[in-house]
Amino acid sequence: MDEILVLTTGGTFDKIYFDAKSRFEVGHSVVEDLLQQAVVKHPCRVVEVMRKDSLELDDADRALIRSVILAAPNKRVVITHGTDTMTDTGRALADITDKVIVLTGALSPARFAETDAMFNLGMAFAAVQTSAPGVYITMNGTVFDALKVVKDRSLNAFTATQEPVGRR
């Protein structure tokens, strides 16, 4: 079994309450804990690349994510990422064609009892093991082509598009 590389970048997935005013900040990643709770036996390695809200990610951050992926021998990569700019990062990675790359995130923090984080991480693990090389986004119970998906903020969900969305 090929080892899956799991990169954490922050986002709502890893947000925690910061103070009594209900302000959130990105905390230490809970991905390893979630994988342990789910009794995942597939070999994987978790690497924290950064701890940022995805609205704070810039081209240099995307270049760093890209360089980590390209430097790794792993052919299967899962990335936990904030949902607001996940599609931007997907487009920035789209020309990496010899690996299976799956981005996922959460609409509420993984530390919350009612969260989609665990489900989305499970979807990402399934997709990364069964998909052809390319870049994908798993959210809302669906595996999307990273070039043919948008986040619909009015629905708080991801939706497929017929045509590729512009590359970065």
Q: Model-found features: residue ranges?
A:
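Active-site histidine-anchored catalytic micro-motif
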Residues: 1-168
